[in-house]
Regions:
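Gly/Pro/Ser/Thr-rich low-complexity, intrinsically disordered segments predominantly at protein N-termini
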Residues: 1-172
Length: 172
């Protein structure tokens, strides 16, 4: 991953804090920032954040030699624009290797957000439900309120995450 600017890094840190808050309520998950993901023997990436199920039928990858091997369940990256070559390459690569959800934030005012979900081998963009919340399938009960994320209202985001994790998870 290319070196991040200060504003990109701050946004990534805030989003990582939110995903890690979810992890604290959800045993059995690895959540790491800037960890290497070996997608195949020839191809690897270092995303902004990786989340993977650590056991059971939803587990998609292994941790060996301090590296994720295989496609994690969830990846998050921060870029400046949708035209960024690294974003386009990563999106295609993560889709091809089976990353279930790829969340991309764009450092702007308001924050831009593209939530990709794997569906029949292709990514489709996820829209919020009627209540304005995007509900992850890769990370059961991770709820992110779109407007609060766009406005960088991290307290509202954390409150929504806590509401989500208080529900019975659907691991189907």
């Amino acid at each position: 991953m290319a070196e991040l600017g200060v504003h990109q890094s701050a946004l990534q840190t805030d989003l990582a804090l939110c995903v890690n808050r979810y992890r604290l309520f959800s045993p059995g998950w690895y959540v790491c920032v800037l960890a290497k993901v070996q997608l195949s023997p020839e191809e690897s990436e270092v995303p902004g954040l990786v989340a993977m199920v650590n056991y059971g039928r939803k587990k998609q990858c292994e941790v060996r030699d301090e590296v994720f091997h295989g496609a994690p369940n969830f990846v998050l990256d921060v870029f400046y624009s949708e035209d960024d070559h690294d974003f386009l390459r990563r999106r295609d690569r993560f889709c091809n290797f089976g990353v279930h959800e790829y969340l991309v934030a764009f450092d702007a005012e308001p924050v831009g957000l593209l939530w990709h979900r794997l569906d029949a081998g292709c990514y489709r963009l996820v829209e919020p439900d009627e209540d304005g919340i995007i509900r992850s399938h890769a990370l059961p009960n991770l709820w992110l309120p779109l407007k609060a994320v766009q406005d960088r209202d991290w307290w509202a985001v954390l409150g929504c995450i806590e509401r989500g994790v208080s529900r019975r998870a659907n691991f189907a």
